[in-house]
């Protein structure tokens, strides 16, 4: 349930 901005303006979400 943690989301953050990743590479190349993508969004990375983890539990």
Curated annotation (Swiss-Prot):
Compartments (UniProt record): Secreted
Principal subcellular localization: secreted
GO CC terms in record: extracellular region
Coiled-coil regions, chain positions: none
Tissues in which the UniProt entry reports expression: Expressed by the venom gland.
Protein name: Short neurotoxin N2
Family classification: Belongs to the three-finger toxin family. Short-chain subfamily. Type III alpha-neurotoxin sub-subfamily.
Known role: Binds with high affinity to muscular (alpha-1/CHRNA1) and neuronal (alpha-7/CHRNA7) nicotinic acetylcholine receptor (nAChR) and hinders acetylcholine binding to the receptor, thereby impairing neuromuscular and neuronal transmission.
Keywords: Acetylcholine receptor inhibiting toxin, Ion channel impairing toxin, Neurotoxin, Postsynaptic neurotoxin, Secreted, Toxin
One MF annotation (Gene Ontology) recorded for this entry: ion channel regulator activity
